[in-house]
C-alpha cells in the first residue's frame, strides 16, 4: 500500500483499529503531506491531474483546503529521490525510539565507483568457481555490485515513519566521494554525532557491505605471493536453497553469538566461506 498516495485530515474520520466488534476512529496529527487547496482551485486541479483522480480529488466534498496528500510513501523511493547519487541498501529496518516511542526507518547508504585507481573490480565467485551473476535472484533486490572497485558505507538515512521526514547522516568523514557530495550539498548531511542516541544505538553492520568485503577477502586473505598467484588457497562464497528450488548465492545473516574471548553474547552478521569443489576441508566464517 505504500506505492499509493493517501489523503489525510479530511472531513471524515479515519478508521484506526477494531475493538470488540467496533471501529476506533482517529485523525492524522502529523505534519507530512502537501495541502490540496480549495475545491476546484488551481492547486486542487493540479493534484487531480498529477494523481489521475479528477473526480476523487478535484470535486470531492470530503476534502478540505488543508487536507494533505502524502506521496512517495515507500521509504527507499522517498530517500532515493533526495540522494540519487548514492546506492541504497535494499533492506531498511524499522526501530522504535527508546525515548520518544516513535517509529523510524533506518537505511544504510553506500558510495561506489568503478574508477578508483589501483583497485581490482569485484567479480565474486561461488564454491564451484563460477562467476556470480546476481546477488540472490528474485529473493534479493540488491543493486548490482559487479565490476565496482570501491564501496564504503559512508552514510545512513533515517525516515520518520509517521511524518515521512528524511534525515541523512555521514558515518565516514574520510570518504573522498562523500566529501565531494557534501561540498555540493552542504546542508544535506549531518554528522553522525548529531543523531539521537535512541536511534544511533540501533545502527548495525550492513550485510550488503559484509558480502562485498567477503567476496574480496576470499581471494586476498592469502599472504604467500606464490600461492596467491596460483589461486590454490582461494576461498569461495557458498550457495543455498532459499525460497526456491534453485541454488542462490548465500547472503550474510544476523544472529546472536557468544564469541570466544568476549564478555557475552553479541548481535553479529556472519557469512561462511566454502572450499573449492575439488577439496573437502572446512574453510572459515567471517
Language-model-derived ranges and their functions:
Residues 1-286:
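Soluble extracytoplasmic regions of secretory-pathway and membrane proteins
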Amino acid at each position: 500500500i505504500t506505492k499509493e498516495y493517501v489523503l489525510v485530515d479530511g472531513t471524515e474520520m479515519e478508521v484506526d483499529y477494531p475493538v470488540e466488534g467496533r471501529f476506533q476512529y482517529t485523525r492524522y496529527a502529523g505534519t507530512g503531506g502537501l495541502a490540496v487547496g480549495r475545491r476546484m482551485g488551481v492547486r486542487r486541479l493540479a493534484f487531480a491531474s498529477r494523481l489521475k483522480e479528477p473526480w476523487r480529488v478535484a470535486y470531492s466534498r470530503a476534502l478540505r483546503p488543508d487536507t494533505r496528500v502524502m506521496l512517495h510513501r515507500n521509504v527507499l523511493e522517498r530517500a532515493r529521490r533526495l540522494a540519487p547519487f548514492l546506492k541504497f541498501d535494499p533492506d531498511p529496518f524499522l526501530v522504535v525510539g527508546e525515548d520518544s516511542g516513535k517509529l523510524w526507518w533506518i537505511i544504510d547508504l553506500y558510495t561506489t565507483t568503478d574508477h578508483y585507481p589501483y583497485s581490482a573490480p569485484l567479480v565474486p565467485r561461488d564454491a564451484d568457481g563460477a562467476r556470480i551473476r546476481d546477488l540472490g535472484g528474485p529473493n534479493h533486490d540488491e543493486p548490482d555490485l559487479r565490476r565496482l572497485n570501491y564501496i564504503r558505507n559512508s552514510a545512513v538515512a533515517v525516515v520518520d515513519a509517521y511524518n515521512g521526514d528524511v534525515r541523512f547522516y555521514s558515518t565516514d568523514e574520510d570518504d573522498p566521494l562523500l566529501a565531494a557530495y557534501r561540498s555540493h550539498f552542504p546542508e544535506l548531511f549531518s554528522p553522525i554525532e548529531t543523531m539521537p542516541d535512541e536511534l544511533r544505538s540501533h545502527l548495525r553492520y550492513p550485510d550488503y557491505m559484509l558480502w562485498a568485503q567477503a567476496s574480496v577477502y576470499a581471494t586476498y586473505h592469502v599472504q604467500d605471493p606464490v600461492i596467491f598467484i596460483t589461486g590454490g588457497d582461494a576461498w569461495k562464497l557458498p550457495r543455498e536453497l532459499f525460497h526456491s528450488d534453485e541454488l542462490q548465492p548465500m547472503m550474510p545473516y544476523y544472529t546472536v553469538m557468544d564469541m570466544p574471548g568476549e564478555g557475552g553474547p553479541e548481535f553479529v552478521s556472519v557469512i561462511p566461506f566454502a572450499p573449492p569443489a575439488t577439496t573437502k576441508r572446512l574453510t572459515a566464517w567471517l
